[in-house]
Amino acid sequence: MSRSPSLPERPHLDLDPEMSDAERLSALRQHFERMVDVNRELDQRLQNADDRHAELVDEVDQMKARNEALKTASYYIATVEELTDDGVIIKQHGNNQEVLTEFAPSLNIDDIEPGDRVAINDSFAVQTVLDDETDARAQAMEVVESPTVTYDDIGGIDEQVREVREAVEQPLENPEMFAEVGIDPPSGVLLYGPPGTGKTMLAKAVANETNASFIKMAGSELVQKFIGEGARLVRDLFKLAAEREPVVVFIDEIDAVASKRTDSKTSGDAEVQRTMMQLLSEMDGFDDRGDIRIIAATNRFDMLDEAILRPGRFDRLIEVPKPAVEGRRHILDIHTRDMNVADDVDLDALAEELDDYSGADIASLTTEAGMFAIRDGRTEVTGADFDAAHEKLSNVDESGTGPISGFTDYQY
C-alpha cells in the first residue's frame, strides 16, 4: 500500500519457505532491481522538486523587487547648476525651476560637478547622479563598420581626392607636421557639385581609409518637428563626436539644414534656422587642430547660407564636377574591371562619346550593357551592348524622364 498517491508503489517481497536457494536468490535479485528503479524515480522527482523550488524562490524575489519598486516614489530629473557651501543649486527639467537643496547622505559630493544630470525627490533632495544624456538618434548615426569603398573605386576626381585627404586624413594621422610648419589644418571640407559625381563615395572612402570613428548623417535628419529638437540633436551629435575622437563627421545634403535665411515667419522655417544656428555654433566650438574633422556635401551650393561658408567652418570648398574624357575613361575601367568584356569594346572611344556623363551615369551605362548581354543569354559583354545601353540612356535623357535629364544646365 502506497504512503502517498504522488509516490511510486513501494516494492514488497514475500518469500515462500518452500523455495529452493536458487529460487530465493532470483526473487531477491528481482526485488533489488525494483527497489533500484523506485529509488531512481524518487531521486528524479526530488531533483524536479528542487528545480521547481528554485524557480518559485526566484519568482518570489522578483515579486518582492517589483513591490518595492511600486512603493518607491518617482524621481524628477534636474541639472546641477552650482555647488556652494550652503548646498547645491539645481535646475529642474521641464519648469526650469532653480532650487537650493542638499545631497542624500549616500552620495559623495566630490563626485558631482556642475552640469551633471541628477535625480531628485519630492523635497528636491539629490538622490543619485545619472549618466550623461545622448540622443539615441545621434548614437545611431555612428558607422560601426567602415564602408568597403576605397580611393581606387573613385575615378575622374583625383585632384579632389588629394585635397580631401590633405584636409581630413593628414591632420588626424600627422598633426605634428602642421604644428611644425606653423599652420592650422582646415577645420572643415565642403564638397559641392552636380549629383552623381562621387561626393558621397569620397566620404565613404575616407571612412574606410582612416582609423578614426565615422559619424554619418543627412541634413534632413536634423530638421525636426518640435521646437528645439533639431538644435538638441546637433548638440548631442557633436557631443558624441567629442567622445569618439579622433572622428570624421560627414553631413550629406547639408543644404537641407543650412539654406539661406529668409524673412519667413512660418514655424517650420524658424526651426530650421534655429537648428542651423546651433550647427554654426558647434562648428566654431572646436580647436582648429582638434581630432574632429567635418565633411559636408551638397548639390545645391547656391542655396547655402554665407555664414556656413566662411573660413573657420569650411576652410576648403571643393568643387566635384563631372569628369573630363580622361576621368570618364578611368571610371569605365573601374566599372568594367570585374566584367567579362569582349575584345571589340573600345573604352577610349566610348569615353569620348559619353560627354556630360557623371560617374553615376557611367555606372548605370555599364549595368545596362551587362543587362543587354544577359537578355541575349550571353556571358560576354560586347561593344554592341554598350552602344545599345548608350542609346537607351540617351533616349531617356531626351524624353526628360531619365536620371540624367536636365543636368546640362544644372546650377550649383
UniProtKB/Swiss-Prot annotation:
It is found in: Cytoplasm. It comes from the Archaea. SMART domains: AAA. Disruption phenotype: Strains lacking panB gene alone display relatively normal growth rate and overall cell yield. Moreover, strains lackings both panA and panB still show robust growth, demonstrating that the PAN proteins are not essential. The keyword Chaperone applies. InterPro entries: 26S_Proteasome_ATPase, AAA+_ATPase, AAA_lid_3, ATPase_AAA_core, ATPase_AAA_CS, NA-bd_OB-fold, Nucleotidase_PAN, P-loop_NTPase. Consists of three main regions, an N-terminal coiled-coil domain that may assist in substrate recognition, an interdomain involved in PAN hexamerization, and a C-terminal ATPase domain of the AAA type. Belongs to the AAA ATPase family. This is Proteasome-activating nucleotidase 2. The lineage of its organism: Archaea, Methanobacteriati, Methanobacteriota, Stenosarchaea group, Halobacteria. The gene is pan2.
